[in-house]
C-alpha cells in the first residue's frame, strides 16, 4: 500500500505545480516571464503620410517678390496648407486621368490636364507657362550634361 500513497502524493504535487505554473503564466504574460512587460506590436493599418512643409520656399518667393515684407506664422500656416491642398488635388486628378488612359505612370500630359481641371483660368495660364519653362530648362540642362559626358568619355571627367 505505501506505493499507492506515493502515487497519490506525486499526482497531487504535480497538479499543484501545474496549477501554480498556470497561475504564474497568467500573471506574467504570454512569454512566461514574471515582472517583465513586453511592448505590444503596433497595429497594421494605413500609414499616415507626412505632409510636406513649403515654408522655406514660400519665404524665398516672398523675399524675391517683396523683400521688405514679412509674414506671420498664422499666415505661413495658411499658405502652406493652400499649397499642400492644391498639390494633393492635382495629384489626385492626374492619377485618375492616368487610370482612364490605362497607364501606370503619370506623365506631363496628365499633369497638364489635371492642372487645367483644378486651377482657375488666370492661375492656369501662369502655371502652364512657368511649368513649360521649367521643363524646358530641365531638359536643356540634362542634355548639356549628357553631351559633355559623351565628349570626354567615361572616366575622363575632371
UniProtKB/Swiss-Prot annotation:
The keyword Acetylation applies. Residues 26-45, 135-158 are annotated as: Disordered. It is found in: Nucleus; Chromosome. Pfam families: Histone (PF00125). One of its GO terms (molecular function) is structural constituent of chromatin. The modification N6-acetyllysine is found at residues 7, 25. Expressed in the generative cell within the bicellular pollen. Not detected in other reproductive or vegetative tissues. GO terms for cellular component: nucleosome; nucleus. Residues 147-158 have a biased composition (Basic residues). Transmembrane segments: none annotated. Keywords: Acetylation, Chromosome, DNA-binding, Nucleosome core, Nucleus. The nucleosome is a histone octamer containing two molecules each of H2A, H2B, H3 and H4 assembled in one H3-H4 heterotetramer and two H2A-H2B heterodimers. The octamer wraps approximately 147 bp of DNA. This is Histone H2B.1. The lineage of its organism: Eukaryota, Viridiplantae, Streptophyta, Embryophyta, Tracheophyta.
Amino acid at each position: 500500500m505505501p506505493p499507492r500513497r506515493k502515487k497519490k502524493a506525486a499526482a497531487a504535487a504535480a497538479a499543484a505545480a501545474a496549477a501554480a505554473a498556470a497561475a504564474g503564466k497568467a500573471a506574467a504574460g504570454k512569454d512566461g516571464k514574471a515582472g517583465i512587460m513586453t511592448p505590444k506590436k503596433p497595429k497594421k493599418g494605413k500609414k499616415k503620410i507626412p505632409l510636406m512643409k513649403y515654408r522655406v520656399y514660400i519665404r524665398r518667393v516672398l523675399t524675391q517678390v517683396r523683400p521688405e515684407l514679412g509674414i506671420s506664422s498664422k499666415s505661413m500656416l495658411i499658405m502652406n496648407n493652400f499649397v499642400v491642398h492644391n498639390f494633393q488635388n492635382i495629384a489626385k486628378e492626374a492619377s485618375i486621368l492616368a487610370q482612364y488612359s490605362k497607364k501606370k505612370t503619370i506623365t506631363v500630359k496628365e499633369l497638364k490636364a489635371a492642372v487645367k481641371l483644378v486651377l482657375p483660368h488666370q492661375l492656369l495660364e501662369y502655371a502652364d507657362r512657368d511649368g513649360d519653362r521649367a521643363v524646358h530648362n530641365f531638359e536643356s540642362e540634362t542634355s548639356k550634361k549628357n553631351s559633355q559626358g559623351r565628349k570626354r568619355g567615361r572616366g575622363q571627367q575632371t
